[in-house]
Swiss-Prot record:
Protein name according to UniProt: Sulfate/thiosulfate import ATP-binding protein CysA
Reaction(s) catalysed by this chain's protein: sulfate(out) + ATP + H2O = sulfate(in) + ADP + phosphate + H(+); thiosulfate(out) + ATP + H2O = thiosulfate(in) + ADP + phosphate + H(+)
Organism annotation: Nocardia farcinica (strain IFM 10152)
A GO CC term assigned to this protein in UniProt: ATP-binding cassette (ABC) transporter complex
Enzyme class, broadest EC rank: translocase
The protein's assembly and partners: The complex is composed of two ATP-binding proteins (CysA), two transmembrane proteins (CysT and CysW) and a solute-binding protein (CysP).
MF (Gene Ontology): ABC-type sulfate transporter activity; ABC-type thiosulfate transporter activity; ATP binding; ATP hydrolysis activity
């Protein structure tokens, strides 16, 4: 387990960490999620020992490491832009940490073979970093970080420099890797989908503080406040409530918007709106709407099937209703 208690870090007048306390369970993958400047990378670097806290305590596996040098914290660290040894093969890059620790040659060979198989690079061991794709280089970086069998694996936006398709593939791969090695892992990301996809738990950060910690289902379905709800995905304000676009039903008359729900349009909170634009997004369709009463813009997300049945056109009048309204705590 990693425990950070009352962590503070200031850069001049800017509070990068403002009294942060968090427990990261052993064997889990925890994502630190937040916008730029929220403090997530500073928290990760403080756990690694790369940033000295102004105040607070960092404990790893029951040991206070607050003043312990990074190389003595038993961690593996992977950055967004990984600096591989260009003159070394993939095998030698992965083996580097083991050789520095003067492990027996047979042990090094066995461990490197095992890791190359786990990360899917066993056929690339004699290649050099320049001969690998970006995704392959990051898999090599993870193998190298895991080679010394660290207690903790720290990942600072490891897939941030890669294109969307490669990132999506590596997210799936990282989740499978974690289920195989079960090392306590902390992942920094600003990508909501990435956090929801791979993490056991998510800590949402904002302005140097932790807004909420919970499972992906907790933070998405039961957000602690409006910031968490807004940051975890698109939202629309409908009749004074924040709702998800895919939780809005659209129809050409109030009864269609109500569907199977009982009650009048007024009691059910049906909103009259004008279609501004219909945007096809592959398997879903975004309907951009303008509230007829307030003039505010909001969006509804509908399936392709519903969109084809409705055949909405710009400028026509429709009715919208929230099918689910998250219960936000009173602020």
């Amino acid at each position: 387990m990693i425990t950070v208690t009352n962590a503070r870090k200031n850069y001049g007048n800017f509070a990068a960490l403002d009294d942060v306390t968090i427990e990261i369970p052993s064997g889990e993958l925890t994502a630190l999620l937040g916008p730029s400047g929220s403090g997530k990378s500073t928290l990760l670097r403080s756990i690694a020992g790369l940033e000295a806290l102004d105040d607070g305590v960092v404990v790893i596996a029951g040991k206070d490491v607050t003043r312990v040098a990074p190389q003595k914290r038993d961690i593996g660290f992977v950055f967004q832009h990984y600096a591989a040894f260009k003159h070394m093969t993939v095998r030698d890059n992965v083996a580097f940490g083991l050789k520095i620790r003067k492990r027996p040659k047979a042990e090094i060979t066995k461990r490197v073979d095992e890791l190359l198989g786990i990360v899917g690079l066993d056929g690339f061991q004699h290649r050099y970093p320049a001969q690998l794709s970006g995704g392959q280089r990051q898999r090599m970086a993870l193998a190298r970080a895991l080679a010394v069998d660290p207690q903790v694996l720290l990942l600072d936006e490891p897939f941030g420099a890669l294109d969307a398709k490669v990132r999506a593939d590596l997210r799936t791969w990282l989740r499978r890797l974690h289920e195989e090695v079960h090392v306590t892992t902390v992942l920094v990301t600003h990508d909501q989908e990435e956090a929801l996809d791979v993490a056991d738990r998510i800590a949402v950060m904002n302005k140097g503080r932790i807004e909420q910690v919970g499972t992906p289902e907790d933070v998405y379905d039961r957000p602690a406040n409006e910031f968490v709800m807004s940051f975890l995905g698109d939202v629309a304000r409908l009749n004074g409530h924040l709702v998800r676009p895919h939780d809005i039903r659209v129809g050409r008359d109030p009864s269609m918007a109500l569907a199977a729900h009982e009650g009048t349009a007024e009691s059910a909170g049906v909103t009259r709106a004008t279609v501004e634009r219909v945007v096809h997004l592959g398997f879903e369709v975004r309907v951009e709407l303008r509230n007829a009463a307030t003039g505010d813009l909001f969006s509804a997300q509908v399936t392709r099937g519903d969109a084809e049945a409705l055949r909405l056109t710009d400028g026509e009048t429709v009715y919208a209703r929230a099918t689910r309204i998250p219960e936000l705590p009173t602020q």
